[in-house]
Amino acid sequence: MDILIVTPRADFWNGLNGVFEKRGASVRTACAMPEALASLKEKKAALAVLDLFGGEAWNGAEHADAMKKAVISILMQDAMTNTASVCGMGEETFHDAMEGLGMINDLPAQPSEADVEDLMSRLRVILGQA
């Protein structure tokens, strides 16, 4: 299973690669959406993790608009790519802001190994691998 992480902080995510690999996933990164879309065109991903704001605190409408555009761009490239955000906006805000986009969940701005484990468990359920 291939995971694409869109992030300006690849070093941070490199520290979590072991969690993905333990679940049988390979990880690649893209520093911005144009690179991510080009990467998806070359090779599909089971999941795109959108860490667009580099660990910044949730900024409301501005971040919501950017996240929606990113998710829609990915779905237009490949509608089978699952997505998750990294904003730490909280469950209620996440559901209100991202309603209808079919995203798995929102991770905290500084995800832990446990957060990644939870995300991978959810993805496996969606993919019928649980």
Language model segments and positions:
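Acidic, metal-coordinating helix/loop segments flanking the phosphotransfer/catalytic sites
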Residues: C31-L47, G55-E56
